[in-house]
Amino acid sequence: HVSALAMYNQTMKYYPDSNPDEFKSIPRSYIGLVGRATYDWKTRYMVEMNVGYNGSENFAPGKRFGLFPAVSAGWVLTEENFMQPLKPWLSYFKLRASYGVVGNDRVSGNYRFLYLPDSYNPSTGSYYFGNSISTAWQGAVESKIGNPDVTWETAAKQNYGVDAYFINSKLKVNFDYFIERRKDILTNRKVLPTYLAANLPIANIGKVDNKGYELSVNWRDRIHD
C-alpha cells in the first residue's frame, strides 16, 4: 500500500497578543509546503517520509526558508514465517527507527523581525548641552540591534524503539531510546561590558544535546466474565 500527500499552507494570525480586542501588533504570518509519502507491505514493512519547507517573516530574505525532512521505518517481525512458532507466547514484535529535523523561529520575549536595522526609542532621561543647565533635552536610546544573518534554529531528533507483546497481548513492553541535537538556538549573548549601553542582537549561538530512554510495561487481563 502506497500513499502520498502534498499541501500548501499559508497562515496569518491577526491577534498575536492575548487580548483579542486590541491590535497591539501587526499580523504574524507563515508560509510553507508539506509533503508526505508512506509505504506499507502487508503490515510487515512500513516506511514514511515527510518534508516541510517553511518560511518565516522573522528572518531576512535569503534566510527565511528552511527545509525540514523526516523519515521513519518499522519492521513487524511477528509477521515473518520464521517467527510463527513463537506465537502465542510472543504475540507482537516490532522494531522501529526514525530521524527528523524540526525548526523554530520563535525567541523568548516574543521578539519579531530579528533582521531589521537598529531601532531607537525616546529616552526617559534628559540631557544638557553647552553652558546652560536650565534647559534639558530629551534624547533617544538604542532599543534593539538587528542581525541580518539570523536564521532558523534546528533540532535533529533520532528515535529507536521496540514494541513487544507477550501472552496474547496481555503483557505489553515498549522501549524507546532517543537522541536530540539542537543547534543554532536563537538567543542573545548575556555577557557584555556595562559601558557598552546596548542590547546585543538575537543570534544563532546556542547548542544543546539531549539523550535518554523510556520504558513502559503494561499488563492487561480479564479476571472473569
Each PLM stretch: what is its role?
Residues H1-D225:
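Extracellular/periplasmic, surface-exposed regions of secreted and cell-surface proteins
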